[in-house]
From Swiss-Prot:
InterPro entries: Antibiotic_NAT-like (IPR028345), DUF436 (IPR006340). This is UPF0340 protein SP_0663. Belongs to the UPF0340 family. HAMAP family: UPF0340. It comes from Streptococcus pneumoniae serotype 4 (strain ATCC BAA-334 / TIGR4). Pfam families: DUF436 (PF04260).
Length: 187
C-alpha cells in the first residue's frame, strides 16, 4: 500500500469532513481506525503500527492547526476507551481509566496517539462533536446526540470504508417553535 496515497486520502477526507461539520476551536473529534481494513484485511487481524502512525499523525496535524481535540477510539478489547490529552480529559471532566493499548488491544491508532500526543491518557467515554470512522469501527457511541451522517468526499482510505458523523442540538418545541439555520441540518 502506498503510504503517500494513504496520507493524501486521509488529509483530503479530514479536511472535507471539517468543512462540512463546521467544527469550532475547542471541539472534540473522535477517530475510529482499523489499519487492517486500510490495508485490505479483516478488522483486527492485520494491524499495522506504521499505518496507524501515518494516519493519526496526519489527523493530529490538521486538527491541531485548528484547535480541535482528537480522541482515538480503541477496539472492544479495551471497551472502546479513547486516548485523549490529559488536559482535554480534565477540561471536559472525562473519567480516566487504567489501560495501556497494544497493537491487538486498543489498536494501532491508540498506540500512535500515545506516541504523538504530549500527555496521553485513556478515558472511558466521551461525547464528541463529530468524528471519522475508517474501517467500520463503530464510533457512534462516542458522538453526542443528535448525530448527523456526513458523506465524505472519498468513500475509502486505502481499502477501508470511510464514514463520518457530525452532531447538532436537539430540536425541541412544537408546531409553533422556530429553529435557527445551521450547516448541518437537512431541512
Amino acid at each position: 500500500m502506498n503510504e503517500t496515497q494513504i496520507q493524501r486520502e486521509t488529509r483530503q477526507v479530514v479536511e472535507d469532513v471539517l468543512e462540512k461539520t463546521n467544527l469550532k476551536q475547542g471541539a472534540l473529534f473522535v477517530l475510529g481506525l482499523s489499519s487492517s481494513e486500510v490495508l485490505g484485511g479483516h478488522i483486527g487481524k492485520e494491524s499495522s503500527q506504521e499505518i496507524g502512525e501515518l494516519i493519526v499523525e496526519t489527523i493530529l496535524d490538521i486538527l491541531g492547526s485548528r484547535g480541535i481535540h482528537l480522541a482515538v477510539q480503541g477496539c472492544e478489547h479495551v471497551n472502546r476507551a479513547l486516548v485523549v490529552e490529559r488536559q482535554v480529559a480534565e477540561q471536559f471532566g472525562l473519567e480516566i481509566v487504567s489501560v495501556h493499548p497494544t497493537l491487538h488491544a486498543g489498536g494501532s491508532g491508540q498506540l500512535a496517539a500515545f506516541k504523538f500526543m504530549q500527555d496521553p491518557v485513556e478515558v472511558e467515554f466521551i461525547k464528541a462533536h463529530a468524528g471519522l470512522d475508517i474501517g467500520d469501527t463503530a464510533i457512534g457511541m462516542h458522538v453526542k446526540h443528535v448525530q448527523v451522517p456526513i458523506r465524505p468526499i472519498l468513500r475509502e482510505i486505502g481499502h477501508a470504508h470511510v464514514t463520518a458523523l457530525a452532531s447538532r442540538p436537539k430540536l425541541i418545541g412544537g408546531a409553533r417553535a422556530h429553529y435557527p439555520q445551521d450547516a448541518i441540518r437537512k431541512f
